[in-house]
Structure formats: structure tokens, C-alpha cells
Amino acid sequence: MSKPVDHVKRPMNAFMVWSRAQRRKMAQENPKMHNSEISKRLGAEWKLLTESEKRPFIDEAKRLRAMHMKEHPDYKYRPRRKPKTLLKKDKFAFPVPYGLGSVADAEHPALKAGAGLHAGAGGGLVPESLLANPEKAAAAAAAAAARVFFPQSAAAAAAAAAAAAAGSPYSLLDLGSKMAEISSSSSGLPYASSLGYPTAGAGAFHGAAAAAAAAAAAAGGHTHSHPSPGNPGYMIPCNCSAWPSPGLQPPLAYILLPGMGKPQLDPYPAAYAAAL
């Protein structure tokens, strides 16, 4: 792109006045030296000059500037526009796909509640009652998580457990046992056992579920589920008093591959069959 004909150059400063002759001399002595390297060396040499050595060039630069102002009274320095830099990439270590945030807000409003609990007091999203009572805040967070990851029935149970645990002095302990009960009931989901072998959801909370089962048995109704001996992927509701002792034999899980027969060791002990 050619420059316009009426382009007015800036007046030279003291360094430009001094380097004009020095650049020509250095280029003749080093014909293969790049212009950027010449400028770098000239700048270093200019800094080494004393004030008395720079004075003649400073005066010459002032004279040229005064002459430039007389010739071009309306001159205004307009720097060249630099090309716009590319937009910075997302600051997040794990970028969220486009449109995922809106889908999550529409399908799972509980995510907003969970985000509000973790936003802190500075954001103004957490009620003062939850800030004053951490047990209620933990119960509300657990209920919000249950609404997202569990079906409606399990979500209702989680909400009831959270409400009951909020008024108890041992709310955090009770909340853990109630969540264990919810996890055992959620094992009936279609994605819980798609390969035909038992899930590990109930076993992970074995100790906590025993206490929850005993409390629920006194009130009556369904307390927990047992895996069916005939079909390991099917959970049978049970209202027995408690789970078998963990010291007898922990529940086992087997993966049946093509070409393999039934395992010799029964993965479910006789205590499960007796409890049915």
C-alpha cells in the first residue's frame, strides 16, 4: 500500500540526527549486517555518549523542529495503527462447550442453587440463615445434588432427609446415612447395571446404610434393596431389620466375558438368600 503524496514526516530527534551519518558509515563497514542489528548497535553507542557530545545534535534537532512547525502549522502526529490482536482464548482450564450452560440451566435448575451455595457471601447469593447455620447449608447442597443426579423419587427422599437433618444436632451424621439409603434405591436406574452384574452403589455405603435401615425399619416400610440371586442386575426391595454384618463376607462382583461359564464361587452368600 503506497503512502499518500501529502504525507508529512515527523521531525528528526537528536538520535536520528546523530545516527543518520553513523548508520551510513556502519553499513559501509559491514555490508552484510542487517538494519535491525545496526540500529541496536547505534542505540548502545548513543547511550555511551556524554551530555556534551550529545549537545550539538540536540540543538540541531530543536532547529529542525522549529522549522517543521513553521512549514506545517497544522501538523499532528498520527501514529500508524497496529493490527488488532487476536482475541484471547478462554481463561478456563476446562472450557465449556457452546450452549451447554443454557441447557444445564433449563434442564437442571438445581445447578443454579448449588452454584449459589458455593459463591460465598460476597456474591450475595447465599441467604444469611444458611451462612449462620452450616448444617442447613450442607443439607441444602445435598438436596440440590440429589435433584440433579437422582430420579424424582430419590430426590424427594433426599429433600426429606435434608429437612429432617437440618434440625438435629447430629445433622451431618444423619445426612450421610440418608444419602446412603438414597444411593441404594437409585441402583434401579436403567444405567445402573447395563451389563448384568451388580452395582457397587450399595456396598460403598454399607456401614452407613445399616444404621439408616434400622431406623427406617422401626417406622415401617421399605428400608433398602438386596440384589437378586437369580438376576444380579435386579434389586429386590427388602424391609429386614439390618444388613448382614460386614465381617461375614463382603459382596463380590464378577464380569462375565464371552466364553466364560458361571463362576464357581457364588458371589452372593447364603445370608442374602436367608434375608429374602
Swiss-Prot record:
Q: Which SMART domains match?
A: HMG
Q: What GO molecular function annotations does the UniProt record carry, in alphabetical order? A: DNA binding; DNA-binding transcription activator activity, RNA polymerase II-specific; DNA-binding transcription factor activity; RNA polymerase II cis-regulatory region sequence-specific DNA binding
Q: Which Gene3D superfamilies match?
A: High mobility group box domain
Which GO BP terms apply?
hair cycle; hair follicle development; positive regulation of transcription by RNA polymerase II; regulation of DNA-templated transcription; skin development; stem cell differentiation
- Null allele phenotype: Expression of ameloblastin AMBN is significantly reduced in the tooth germ of postnatal day 1 (P1) molars, but ASCL5/AmeloD expression is not altered.
Q: Does the keyword DNA-binding apply?
A: yes
Extract one GO cellular component term from the record. Answer: nucleus
UniProt-annotated location(s)? Nucleus
Xref: InterPro entries: HMG_box_dom, HMG_box_dom_sf, SOX_fam, SRY-related_HMG-box_TF-like
Q: Which UniProt keywords apply?
A: Activator, DNA-binding, Nucleus, Transcription, Transcription regulation
According to the entry, DNA is bound by residues in 8-76
Keyword DNA-binding annotated: yes
Query: What role does this protein play?
Result: May play a role as an activator of transcription of OPRM1. Overexpression of SOX21 can up-regulate the OPRM1 distal promoter activity in mor-expressing neuronal cells. May play a role in ameloblast differentiation.
The name under which this protein is listed is Transcription factor SOX-21
